[in-house]
């Protein structure tokens, strides 16, 4: 069976944890930050986990991570 290619955009956006969960960055923190509260910006610094519904799809995109 041939090697699988890793999806380049996905390998930059997702990280697989030691337990197998997929971590992603939070949206809402790229531009127009002056109008957002300090609390909101601080909250979105942390990552979030991918939902169970999308996890299988993303694992196919990054097979070797």
Curated annotation (Swiss-Prot):
Keywords from the named record: Ribonucleoprotein, Ribosomal protein
InterPro entries per UniProt: Ribosomal_bL35, Ribosomal_bL35-like, Ribosomal_bL35_CS, Ribosomal_bL35_sf
Single GO MF descriptor: structural constituent of ribosome
Organism: Ruminiclostridium cellulolyticum (strain ATCC 35319 / DSM 5812 / JCM 6584 / H10) (Clostridium cellulolyticum)
GO biological process, one term: translation
Similarity comment text for this entry: Belongs to the bacterial ribosomal protein bL35 family.
Gene Ontology CC, one term: cytosolic large ribosomal subunit
Domain of life of the native organism: Bacteria
Protein name (database record): Large ribosomal subunit protein bL35
Keyword Transcription: no
Pfam family of the protein (one): Ribosomal_L35p
